[in-house]
């Protein structure tokens, strides 16, 4: 007899969901429930969602030299990718040149090395920056890398007002989950808001921050904690920007978010829907913006790298496919699908192509893109959405009581929370309560890698 899991990965009970009450509380499409494109944006930020325009297929890439990464970029664009996403190596993320002693052994290892504007020229050689949007996963030295990008756009004759893209620029999650920071928290926050102010006046189509739950989820937090911690960080950035003299409508329309898409399909869909509604409520209540876009949560999604296994790696292609499906069902604005071999090393050209094809198959063959918020009205999904809003909202209030996200970072509050959730997850793996096919269970099977 199959042993079913009674709880989601965040600990929500599945077996005692009050289906009828959930339907009554959540409402149904066409029954007075807000439509897609209408506040609070639970069902999506655009009325037609993917019926009129697909999400941006933005594969994360970067390795070795700028020249080699440029070749991968151009290959992906030729294969149908619709946006760029740059991975930088650790020395670049820490503001170190490749010949710095502390960079030894790390140059070009997990991303591309950018030491100078010459490297940036090579990175975007033969790529029209006026025709493609570029996301740069860079935080502590975000101002420097953006300055290089703008300089290359200037050389190409692309107006600064026309360049489109994103810098992650989310330093709080570096203190919480990654550790790639350079300056103390308060000074780092000042640099973050300085970039927002510059873009307001010079690059109005540039997303000045991508508030990231992804890295905290990879470090071990739950879906509920991912939403709560991410939106709490976003509130801190918003308050800091306003304290610096910016108005909410000066920068909030160009704030973006970045979430993980993990294994629990329905919980992940509910998570995305909940994050949109909760962010709308938080912004409207505290800041009262006039522009509609100031309270809309736009987000990028990446499939969960932490779920990939080195054992039986072809299984990862299946994991990535259904994680990508969750992101699309949840209304993501852009998506990166991991390559099946990433637990073993940098993706090959072939595995990167398969990852891109996964998105294209979902877009063109499944019919999912032809319906808006197709799981709306599901008793289970609506109940999960409501619970995540409630529990994540409680977490945000607790962080505010403790002085806000910045003060909690200094005390280690978020870090401790993530460590505890990661430990719980590890215990479930070790006891067999959580299955990982090919690594924890069914390990005796060997899948062929050649025909």
Report the location of each language-model feature.
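Phosphate/diphosphate-binding loops
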Residues: 186-196, 313-316, 392-410
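Short glycine/threonine-rich loop-to-helix capping motif typified by GTGT followed
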Residues: 145, 220-228, 262-274, 303-317, ...
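A glycine-rich phosphate-binding loop feature that marks nucleotide/adenosyl-phosphate handling sites
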Residues: 90, 167-172, 210-218, 252-262, ...
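Mobile "lid/hinge" segments at catalytic clefts and subdomain interfaces of large enzymes
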Residues: 195-196, 200-238, 318-392
């Amino acid at each position: 007899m199959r042993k079913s899991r009674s709880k989601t990965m965040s600990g929500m009970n599945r077996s005692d969901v009050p289906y009828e009450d959930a339907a009554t509380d959540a409402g149904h499409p066409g029954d007075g429930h807000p439509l897609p494109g209408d506040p609070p944006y639970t069902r999506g930020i655009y009325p037609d969602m993917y019926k009129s325009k697909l999400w941006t297929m933005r594969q994360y890439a970067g390795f070795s030299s700028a020249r080699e990464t440029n070749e991968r970029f151009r290959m992906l664009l030729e294969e149908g990718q619709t946006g760029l996403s740059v991975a930088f190596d650790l020395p670049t993320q820490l503001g170190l040149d490749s010949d710095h002693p502390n960079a030894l052994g790390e140059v070009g290892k997990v991303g591309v090395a950018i030491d100078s504007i010459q490297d940036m020229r090579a990175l975007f050689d033969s790529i029209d920056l006026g025709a493609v949007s570029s996301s740069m996963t860079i935080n502590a030295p975000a101002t420097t890398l953006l300055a290089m990008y703008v300089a290359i756009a200037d050389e190409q004759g692309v107006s600064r007002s026309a360049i489109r893209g994103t810098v992650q620029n989310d330093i709080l999650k570096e203190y919480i989950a990654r550790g790639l920071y350079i300056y103390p928290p308060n000074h780092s926050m000042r640099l973050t808001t300085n970039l927002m102010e510059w873009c307001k006046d010079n690059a109005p189509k540039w997303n000045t921050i991508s508030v990231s739950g992804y890295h905290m989820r990879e470090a071990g937090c739950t879906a509920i904690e991912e939403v709560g911690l991410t939106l709490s960080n976003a509130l801190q950035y918003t308050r800091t920007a306003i304290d610096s003299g910016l108005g909410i409508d000066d920068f909030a329309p160009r704030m973006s978010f970045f979430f993980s898409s993990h294994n629990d399909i329905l919980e992940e869909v509910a998570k995305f829907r909940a994050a949109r509604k909760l962010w709308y409520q938080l912004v409207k209540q505290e800041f009262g913006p006039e522009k509609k876009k100031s309270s809309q949560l736009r987000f990028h999604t990446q499939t969960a790298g932490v779920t990939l296994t080195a054992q039986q790696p072809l299984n990862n292609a299946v994991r990535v496919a259904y994680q990508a499906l969750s992101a699309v069902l949840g209304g993501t604005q852009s998506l990166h699908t991991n390559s099946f071999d990433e637990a073993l090393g940098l993706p090959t050209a072939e595995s990167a192509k398969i990852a891109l094809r996964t998105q294209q198959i979902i877009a063109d063959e499944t019919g999912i893109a032809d319906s808006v918020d197709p799981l709306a009205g599901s008793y289970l999904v609506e109940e999960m959405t409501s619970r995540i809003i409630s529990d994540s909202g409680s977490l945000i209030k607790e962080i505010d009581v403790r002085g806000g996200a910045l003060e909690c970072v200094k005390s280690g509050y978020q870090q401790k929370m993530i460590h505890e959730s990661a430990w719980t997850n590890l215990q479930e793996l070790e006891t067999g309560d959580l299955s990982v096919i090919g690594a924890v269970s069914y390990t005796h099977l060997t899948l062929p890698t050649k025909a």
